[in-house]
Curated annotation (Swiss-Prot):
Gene3D superfamilies: LmbE-like. InterPro entries: GlcNAc_PI_deacetylase-related (IPR003737), LmbE-like_dom_sf (IPR024078), Mycothiol_biosynthesis_MshB (IPR017810). The keyword Ribosomal protein does not apply. Its cofactor is Zn(2+). Its EC number is 3.5.1.103. The gene is mshB. It holds the Pfam family PIG-L. It comes from the Bacteria. Belongs to the MshB deacetylase family. Catalyzes the deacetylation of 1D-myo-inositol 2-acetamido-2-deoxy-alpha-D-glucopyranoside (GlcNAc-Ins) in the mycothiol biosynthesis pathway. This is 1D-myo-inositol 2-acetamido-2-deoxy-alpha-D-glucopyranoside deacetylase. Keywords: Hydrolase, Metal-binding, Zinc.
Length: 308
């Protein structure tokens, strides 16, 4: 539970029966997640999003592109891809909307509006269409996000680490834009985090995943190159209470994610099986840390935040 959680739960209950006031809005925890493409919000932070929504927080997700360059899983929608009809971006808006609904978030928000910047593709792919997000003017992009920060006034902001998690140019650019926006905004963000993947956490998830589809390539945790060791992590969120919502959101991104029938693992277009862990990990970039457990980790991103 986060700080002032009892207040947040009472406010959530009152709003459910139509009672609201500006004072109540001021006391509700607000979290902003900034992601590069539709599906990133679910893969990296979906459990955390649903976890805090369930506890009465106001959660917003900003997505920087429509993911037009994504590879399409399966034949049903293969013709939407960039080398064919190039209509994948619009379809992924619908997928994102459904995924966010599964997580408890009302609607998507796109930086600059839907389609303002295009998915840049992987680092080794040609620049087939413009304007690519990786080429976005930093002042414009950071200014647009800073305006969102000043309007929404989040207590917590989450985005990727400097490597963008696994090196995708749009993830790296999202990190840069978010960092610049946090520095530029008039609103002083109390806590700023990177979403990361823990080697120990993924190792535990690999150990318990069962009934992986035969057609998927099975690897070990040692084959995953972008994981963080425990000494580099500052916070963990137990998302076991919201794992069903995360799995449902993954299934909503059907052009991008395959989910095992038992919901314990998933695969992208590369068909590499990855477990779906019941914990999500973070690095605290700025802001005062809250109480820590025996490992030295916070267990609540809102720990220590004054909501008043």
């Amino acid at each position: 539970m986060f700080a002032d959680s009892a207040v947040a739960c009472v406010i959530s209950a009152l709003r459910a029966v139509g009672v609201d006031s500006p004072l109540m809005s001021e006391l509700v925890p607000r979290l902003l997640f900034v992601h590069a493409h539709p599906d990133d919000e679910t893969l990296t932070t979906g459990g955390t999003i649903a976890h805090y929504v369930r506890r009465g927080a106001d959660v917003r997700v900003v997505t920087c592109t429509l993911g037009e360059e994504g590879e399409v899983i399966g034949e049903q929608y293969a013709q939407l891809a960039v080398d064919h009809a190039d209509q994948l971006g619009g379809y992924r808006i619908a997928e994102l909307t459904a995924a966010l609904a599964a997580l408890g978030v009302d609607a998507p928000h796109f930086l600059g509006g839907p389609g303002h910047w295009r998915d840049s593709g992987m680092a080794d792919t040609p620049a087939r269409h413009q304007p690519r997000f990786v080429d976005a003017d930093m002042a414009e992009a950071a200014g647009l996000l800073a305006a969102i920060l000043d309007d929404f006034r989040p207590h917590v902001v989450v985005t990727y680490d400097p490597d963008g998690g696994y090196g995708h140019p749009d993830h790296v650019q999202t990190h840069r834009v978010t960092t610049a926006a946090v520095e530029r905004a008039q609103w002083q963000v109390p806590k700023f985090y990177w979403t990361v993947m823990s080697k120990s956490g993924m190792g535990d998830a690999f150990a318990v995943a069962r009934d992986v589809p035969e057609e998927w390539l099975q690897v070990s945790v040692d084959d995953v190159p972008f994981l963080y060791t425990d000494d580099r992590i500052d916070a963990v969120v137990d998302v076991s209470d919201s794992i069903e919502a995360k799995v449902a959101a993954m299934r909503a991104h059907a052009t991008q994610i395959s989910v095992a029938p038992n919901g314990q693992s998933c695969a992208l277009s590369n068909n590499i099986a990855m477990p779906i862990p019941g914990v999500e990990h973070y690095v605290l970039v700025s802001g005062a840390p809250g109480p820590r457990d025996a490992r030295g980790w916070e267990t609540d991103l809102l720990a220590g935040v004054n909501l008043a």
